[in-house]
UniProtKB/Swiss-Prot annotation:
The lineage of its organism: Eukaryota, Fungi, Dikarya, Ascomycota, Saccharomycotina. Keywords: Cell cycle, Cell division, Cytoplasm, Cytoskeleton, Meiosis, Sporulation. It is found in: Cytoplasm, Cytoskeleton, Microtubule organizing center, Spindle pole body. Disulfide bonds: none annotated. It comes from Saccharomyces cerevisiae (strain ATCC 204508 / S288c). This is Accumulates dyads protein 4. One of its GO terms (biological process) is ascospore formation. GO terms for molecular function: structural molecule activity. One of its GO terms (cellular component) is meiotic spindle pole body. The gene is ADY4.
Amino acid sequence: MNKDVDYQTFKKSLRKEFKKAVKTILNLQAYNGDLIRDFLALYIPYHVVFYNLSIMKKGSPLRIQTNNLLKEALAKILNFNLAMGPKHIIKIMKKDKADPETMNKLKLVLYIKLFQGVFGHVDKNYNLAFQSFRWCLQFIAYSKRTRLFASIADEQIGAFYELCELFISMLCCHCFLIDLKENEALVGNNLKNFIKRQNPNYSHGFDLNEETKSLQWHWSLDEVDVIEALYCVAFDAMDKITLKFSKVNENFVFSQFFQYCAEIEEMLAILRGKIWECECDVFGPRIGLLVDSNHMNETIQKNILSITFKLKNDPQIICCLNKILEGLLLSSGVQFKVIQFFYVLKLYYMQDNEYTFEASSEMDKLTIECLCIIENIIDACDNPDEVTDYQLPKVLLTAMEGKLLVAEKISEDNDCSESLDDYHPRTYQFRHPRIIIDKMKTKLKQKLRFDSPKDPETDDHWIEYWKYCYQDNIGNLPDILSRIYQTFTDPSN
């Protein structure tokens, strides 16, 4: 969170620039590849600011104009069509003479597919957007592999490729995750049907091994491979990035990058979760999914990083805090005071942010249910200080969109005799992303190689990590945040 620049001021400035770019496109009488590229180069890194504008919607003058311009330009290319795969198109281009005309064809094809993905995302056709963006990434990879630019120096298209590999890979993965969450037949219903064992007919002769095998449906799917491949492209692009941004734009870009990373880690935590059998009752055993602790820790970490890069009054600060609270609850076993701390932090930012309604409207069902449980626990406490030493129970998923199952009662940490196991590790391991961003800002290396000032096993670790990120990215804690921090970390309080 940048203390000098307000998010709304930043957004207004960007939209003013975007309005000029739109006007330029609308005034074109014929296709101009450079102006189309410049428009996309502005839109792609800041799409979260632009995508819901009316000018991007179906039937808008911009949509009509870009479709006409690109269609007319494509009609002049006779040796292929977009129904071909990216690899096949690259092979055809490679046979042509490596001249500016070939390069213009290459750019045109990429721009068409990018607009297809952009408009698919705007229309909430996430499958179309995912397929189009993935096509673009494959197209870029094949063109680089075949060295189509070897004989022609074109720094602009090289920089545009770099921008696409970083931002389109994250946007592509974002669309894939949304489509995955909304696909009840693929995810939600499967998990619910596997878990649902409350029929009395199943209370005898229940084969846990067979149930566990059937529940591990996610191992046989390729969702994890798709997500990790896109994740890898984005991290590799961030490692090699040479793009230059102003300080404010840089902070915005990093905040969005880490927020997308957190979203990816959350889904990996679910897809790589382990099956747990809960205590039997009159209806038979209950089965749930315990999320993967490593990926959930990464989710929390990247949301904290994202918050401290946010601009002042960015409504996404609240979104990230909601996700941190969700992650802490699903991590199973954290001390309640850690959740209390981030809950109070959320209240602090809500008081200072008049745009929090934007964040609340974006919450998914799982986040809403987690927040509801947390608020119920807090409301049930006559004196919250008395429960700060309590360890929260295991919380299992019985459906992708929520429907949580508490697997054990709250117990005091000192009385907890539970043995360590790979399902419920007591030691939090933080594997920071080794993104070397020295080409953008050398000092950012330190942000991504944080060594906790305390042992990771301590209950204050996440609170200390937040403080570290805040001080490193923003500056000294203001008085009110300093008092909040001391309340939850100083034993004398």
